[in-house]
Amino acid sequence: GIRIDSKVVYRGWAIPQSIYIDYDVLASCHPALNWSGIGDILCFHTGVLDWRYAEREGKIEEKWRYDEGLAQQSLRKVRGIVENIDNIRVMNDQGIEALVDGLKWGTSYHGAGWCPRHIEGTDHFLFYTLEKLTGKKFLHGQPVGLGVIVGSMLHEDGAEEMLDTISSIGLDIRPEAMGLTWDQLAEGLKLLRSYVNKVGLWHSIAHDVKISDGFITDLQNRLNHAYHHKKS
């Protein structure tokens, strides 16, 4: 994926012959850098929800027709993160393996038959909107993880479990952890619908739903409760 005029598009074709993973190097990294990796796996949850939504609405792209087999495989990778919260938090070998297994299926999308449709939806679209709005550079998993919660809330599917997983692992997705104010996030959330339609990102629930002040208040309450609970 590369950015062209602020829009992420998929270009190129290459098959890696071998990939070397040094567990000791990964285990020695700052925890937040590793924890950030869960964003690009948990996004399969909202990516699949948006893929199914676009199919139901008759707005799916011809190039990325819905594939239930790929969707189910992607959701199994999400379960791999949910079931390894403790291992990922301490970054032991099992935790690293859970991350590697999920990331090789999605981020390196050659593992999914060259189809990136399950990889991103509302989750990444919020990230792109905030990036465009603020000009900031983010630790990837933070805005994506926040987008997973926003997308799950919009779909009314799995938001509590996703937030518990993210906060229990230790990744802080509150706006203040990314150098944003709540006012900036609120502006980004309200801009999301117009931005994704203007840029022409593939169809998601974010294209159709207007985010209200009540939704933003609910999101803030959920985040504050999740992280206060983890610290108490």
Predicted regions and their residues:
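Solvent-exposed, flexible loop/coil residues
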Residues: 3-6, 13-17, 142, 150, ...
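Short, charge-rich amphipathic segments
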Residues: 3-13, 52-61, 79-96, 121, ...
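A glycine/threonine-rich phosphate-anchoring loop and its flanking beta-alpha core
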Residues: 1-74
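Active-site segments that bind and position negatively charged phosphate/pyrophosphate groups
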Residues: 65-170, 176, 180
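C-terminal charged capping/lid subdomain of soluble metabolic enzymes
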Residues: 41-46, 50, 54, 60-61, ...
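A short hydrophobic/aromatic micro-motif that marks alpha-helical segments and, especially, helix-coil
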Residues: 37, 138-139, 196-197
